[in-house]
Design a protein with these regions (language model features):
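Acidic, Mg2+-coordinating active-site environments of NTP-dependent enzymes
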Residues: 2-146, 221-231
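ATP-dependent carboxylate-amine ligase
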Residues: 12, 50, 87, 107-249
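Short linear Ser/Thr-Pro motifs
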Residues: 1, 55-57, 193, 204-205
Length: 249
């Protein structure tokens, strides 16, 4: 669906170039490849592919496209309605917000087409699909909306926060932390993203593994310090979540 510098470090890939080469190997070991044409790195990943290639995206050049996107809000469930064009032609709606959710939906639609899944079954599945921990609605108050999302790198966090701002729900509070024994660059970048896009960031501990939680938080603060964003530091995750709920509006 997309690829950005991630999973790079002493215990992961040596470089982004190596990461892309490894992803590209998948398209030399299959008969049909399905790729997001809108991703800026898609041609590099597909270089040397031996499979029959199909693309999807929002651009006119994609084989399978989403057009006419509009935001929806049904009882607190933020979503997107759009038309599927190109290789297929029907109206669709998903109960998850954002362009990234549309890209994920297009991936699923493209796969279903190859397996001959009826269009009505595809439409129903898209309307009803929910993913635990991915833009998951947690009902705690009628005064604000609380969502949980796994967004674990800067690209995912920026996509999420940008999407939520499009719904114009007012004040945006972001509670997050970063995992230990992973790239420190990720922490700086996520701090900068949240500081730039959220009205308030609550920095907390996530899964420190074998690092000191405070050291990870300090790295996040380095990133957020590059912005004018407001933030508060609460190391205990339960207390951080409680603070965000108590101060929600």
């Amino acid at each position: 669906t997309n690829i950005e510098p991630d999973h790079i470090g002493p215990n992961e890939h040596g470089s982004f170039e190596e990461y892309m080469r490894c992803k590209g190997m998948l398209f030399r070991q299959c008969r049909v490849g399905i790729a997001n044409r809108d991703d800026s790195h898609w041609e590099q990943v597909m270089e040397g592919h031996t499979c029959r290639l199909e693309t999807y995206g929002l651009s006119e050049e994609a084989d399978l496209r989403a057009e006419g996107m509009r935001l929806t809000n049904r009882n607190g469930h933020l979503g997107v309605a759009f038309q599927v064009k190109g290789l297929m032609d029907f109206d669709a709606e998903i109960a998850m917000p954002g362009r990234f959710s549309v890209y994920n939906a297009l991936t699923a639609i493209a796969i279903c087409r190859h397996f001959g899944v009826p269009v009505e079954a595809v439409k129903k599945a898209l309307r009803e699909a929910r993913v635990k921990g991915r833009i998951e609605l947690v009902k705690v108050s009628d005064e604000f909306t609380l969502l949980i999302d796994y967004a674990h790198n800067a690209m995912a966090l920026e996509s999420l926060l940008t999407t939520l701002k499009e719904y114009d729900h007012g004040r945006l509070v972001c509670v997050f932390g970063c995992g230990g024994n992973r790239s420190r660059l990720r922490r700086y970048e996520m701090g900068e993203v949240s500081g730039r896009l959220a009205d308030l960031t609550v920095i907390t501990s996530d899964n420190p593994r074998f690092e000191e939680p405070q050291a990870i938080i300090d790295d996040i603060k380095t990133g957020i310090g590059k912005t004018d964003g407001k933030y508060i530091e609460i190391c205990d995750r339960k207390e951080a979540i409680a603070y965000a709920i108590d101060n929600g509006q």
